[in-house]
Structures are given as structure tokens and as C-alpha cells.
Regions:
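Juxtamembrane intracellular "pre-TM" segments in multi-pass secondary transporters
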Residues: 3-19, 204-235
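Helix-loop boundary and gating motifs at the non-cytosolic
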Residues: 8-68, 233-238, 242-256, 260, ...
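Glycine-rich segments within core transmembrane alpha-helices of 12-TM secondary carriers
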Residues: 68-71, 151-170, 176, 365-376
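Helix-to-loop junctions at the C-terminal end of transmembrane segments
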Residues: 70-87, 281-298, 383-384
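C-terminal ends and interior cores of transmembrane alpha-helices
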Residues: 93-113, 304-321
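Symmetry-related core transmembrane helices of the 12-TM Major Facilitator Superfamily/SLC fold
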Residues: 95-101, 183-200, 390-408
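C-terminal transmembrane helical hairpin of 12-TM major facilitator-type secondary transporters
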Residues: 297-344
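A late C-terminal transmembrane helix in Major Facilitator Superfamily
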Residues: 355-384
Length: 423
């Protein structure tokens, strides 16, 4: 891989890059990637809570997102074979997006109590096709963006991703106060259409290496390439731990808000739509700051802000129902999370080899997903036994190990470290 040039000063050409075709595609593809995630998480948790499902089981529903963790197992297949239409990336992307629309509709026509098996099966299908979409989107973005635009491109992707999440959870919860959940899920499936249109209209990225000639080359060589570099294992451990505190806290917030006394409309309006501005500002600001700071310093600064924002939930748990405090906590959490995720995504993209983009990136994001699923699956049980305030304090402290790994993975001297990471 060539050397990343993410420490360039902000220049007048930045605006031209921001509004380029590549950034628009990264944004829309991010939206398509973020929309399905909370349909099998936050929105589904709200539906289960409304149906009276036990909090422990609500926390464990996050296990249906296992496909996000194991997507590296079928990523080589998407690298090796090329559909007979649209090319290797866009062809697989179109297949995944159409299948995803159908799976979302199917999930809406299940029932958390009467058709539990159907609900779990449909949720697994949504997660599988969503994870497949993510594999192709990540590969497309890495191949489409030059190295010097990875930071800003990653922030635009996060920008769209968070907007998709907010539309699904915030919009979904507000609609659920007035419409049935099956109708809500049907409407959410229609929101996949912009991503499908983008897939049809955007060009296929130009890649010199092309598709692997054999399945052996597609499966074995990406892993040999990755694990041959210095610190490969430490990087995986870092990816597992960096956002674990933020993930644990956000994984059970919907039941927390409901138990604190907030209505679904208040949650949708304040938690989601009020947080939209902070999220979008955070993602965009994170990308622009990465051009100036570099990825390493961004990981340090944004990681500290993430941990502090998690502590805000502990304060809210102690004080109780307070719309103003909720607004402040959510604004801070969304701002810091948007910035931190932009740096995190740019970091993972920067250490992949363009010859093996889909498989290597799927491995890295799979490790990130493993952290999310394992941590989130026990959050309901932990909150039930610890109480909300102690639980959120724990989530704040558990972020420390990941931050300490930055001393090895991403030292503050970002320019030297960024160059050392390039292979």
C-alpha cells in the first residue's frame, strides 16, 4: 500500500473534494449501510419492550447481528466471483440491497411474542444481507478513494451511516407511536431505494489487481498478507476494545429511556432527531480534522471524548427524567461518537491492502462487530443486576484498555506512525 497522506493542511480545495462525486457516493452508501442496523437492534428492542419481553432477552437479541462479525467468511466469495452485470462491486451490491429490502419487510410481518422463531429468522436475514452490503460498500469505498481522501471519505460514509441509523430508529420510533410496527418496517424498506439508484448510476471503481484467479488466492492470500505485518494481532485487539464502552452503553439505551419515563415520541424527537445535528457535525468535523491532525491523533482525541460522553448517561440515570439534560447528553454523545467513528473507520481502511480489500476490511469490521455483539448481548443482564447508573459508570471505565493500546497502535506522533503503518 502506498503511504497515506492524511496530515495535509486544510486547503481551499477541501470544499471541492467534499462536494465531489466520490464523497456523495460515500455518503449515500453510508446511509444504505446504516439504515438496517437498528432495525434489528433499537427498533426491535422497542417492539419487544412494548410486547412485555423480559429485559434479559431484549439485550440478547443483539446476537442476531452475528453475521456482521462473521462476514469475513464469505467476503472472499465476493472478491473471487463477478456477477454477469454491473461489475464485481456494483453487481454484488445490487443483489444484496434488493434481498435486504425483502428481508426488512419480512421482519416487520413477524411478531416478538407470537412468532418468535420467524422474528429471529427474519432478523438474521436482515443482518446477513446488510453485512453482505457492508462488505461490498467498504471494498468499493477503499478502491474508489485515493489515500489522501480516506479520512474525509470515511467521515462522509459515517455521516451517511449515522443519518441512516437515526432515520431508522428515530423516525421508526415516532412512526411506531402512530402506526403498526409492520407498517414501520415496510416504510423503512423503501428507504433503501436511494442506495439502489446510486449502485445503478455510479461507475465501477478501477482496480489494477482485478479479481483473484482462484478461491485459494481469494481466501488464503488476504490473511497471509495481513498477518505478515508487524503488530497484526495487537491491531485486532485494539479494534475489539476501542469502542467497547460506547457500544455497551448505546446497546441498551432504548429500554433505559423508556424506563426513565420518556415516551417513544420524546425518544424519537430528542434522542434521534435532536442528535442528528450533533452527529452530522461530528462526522464532518472529524473528517476535516483528520486532514489536519492525522488518523492517530484523531483516535486519541476523539476516543477520550467518546468515553466522557458515556459518563453523561450515568448522570442522566442518577437525575432521572429531564428533557434538557437528555438533550445535552445526547448532543455530546452523538458529536463525539461521530468524530470517533470517522477516525476509527479511516484507520481500518488505511491498513488494508487494495489487492484484498473486501476480505481484509471484512475481517477488521468483523472484529469490531464481535465486540458489539458480545458486549451488547450481556448489557440487559448487567443493567438489570447493577442498576442503570452503575452500569453506565462501568461502560465509561471499560474504555480505558482500548485507549491504552493507542500507545502501541497509534502513538501521538501521528506523521511517523501513519507512515510506519503503510505497507
Amino acid at each position: 500500500m502506498g503511504k497515506s497522506n492524511l496530515n495535509l493542511p486544510i486547503q481551499q480545495s477541501t470544499l471541492k473534494v467534499v462536494f465531489s462525486r466520490r464523497m456523495l457516493v460515500a455518503f449515500i452508501m453510508g446511509f444504505s449501510g446504516g439504515l438496517p442496523l437498528l432495525l434489528t437492534w433499537g427498533v426491535l428492542q422497542a417492539w419487544m419492550t412494548e410486547k412485555g419481553v423480559d429485559l434479559t432477552w431484549i439485550g440478547m437479541i443483539s446476537l442476531v447481528q452475528i453475521p456482521y462479525t462473521w462476514k469475513f467468511l464469505w467476503a472472499p466469495f465476493l472478491d473471487r466471483f463477478v456477477p454477469p452485470f454491473l461489475g464485481r462491486r456494483r453487481g454484488w451490491l445490487l443483489i444484496a440491497q434488493i434481498a435486504l429490502m425483502g428481508a426488512i419487510v419480512g421482519l416487520g410481518y413477524s411478531d416478538p411474542v407470537k412468532n418468535t422463531g420467524l422474528m429471529i429468522g427474519a432478523a438474521l436475514l436482515v443482518a446477513f444481507f446488510s453485512a453482505t452490503q457492508d462488505i461490498v460498500i467498504d471494498a468499493y469505498r477503499r478502491e474508489d478513494l485515493p489515500d489522501e481522501e480516506l479520512g474525509l471519505g470515511s467521515s462522509m460514509y459515517v455521516y451517511g451511516y449515522r443519518l441512516g441509523m437515526l432515520l431508522a430508529s428515530g423516525g421508526g420510533l415516532i412512526l411506531a407511536d402512530h402506526l403498526s410496527f409492520p407498517t414501520v418496517y415496510f416504510l423503512m424498506s423503501l428507504c433503501m431505494l436511494p442506495g439502489i439508484l446510486t449502485t445503478l448510476l455510479t461507475p465501477e471503481p478501477e482496480v489494477v489487481a482485478g479479481a483473484p484467479r482462484t478461491m485459494k488466492a481469494a481466501v488464503v492470500e488476504p490473511f497471509l498478507d495481513y498477518f505478515s505485518r508487524n503488530g497484526a494481532i495487537w491491531i485486532l485487539v485494539f479494534i475489539l476494545l476501542y469502542k467497547i464502552g460506547d457500544t455497551m452503553a448505546s446497546g441498551i439505551t432504548i429500554p433505559f429511556y423508556l424506563e426513565t419515563g420518556f415516551s417513544k415520541t420524546e425518544i424519537g424527537t430528542v434522542v434521534k432527531f435532536f442528535g442528528t445535528a450533533a452527529t452530522l457535525i461530528g462526522a464532518f468535523a472529524g473528517g476535516v480534522l483528520l486532514l489536519k491532525l492525522g488518523i492517530n491523533r484523531g483516535l486519541w482525541i476523539f476516543g477520550i471524548l467518546q468515553a466522557l460522553s458515556t459518563a453523561g448517561f450515568a448522570i442522566l440515570a442518577r437525575i432521572g427524567y429531564n428533557i434538557s439534560l437528555l438533550s445535552g447528553v445526547i448532543a455530546f454523545e452523538n458529536l463525539s461518537s461521530g468524530m470517533g467513528t470517522a477516525a476509527f473507520v479511516a484507520f481500518m481502511a488505511s491498513i488494508t491492502n487494495k489487492k484484498f480489500t473486501a476480505t481484509q476490511y471484512a475481517l477488521l469490521t468483523g472484529i469490531m462487530g464481535l465486540s458489539r455483539q458480545l458486549a451488547s448481548s450481556v448489557t440487559g443482564l448487567m443493567a438489570k443486576n447493577m442498576g442503570w447508573q452503575s452500569f453506565f459508570v462501568f461502560c465509561t471505565l471499560i474504555a480505558i484498555p482500548g485507549m491504552l493500546l493507542l500507545l502501541k497502535i497509534a502513538p501521538w506522533n501521528s506523521r511517523a506512525a501513519d507512515e510506519a503503518r503503510a505497507i
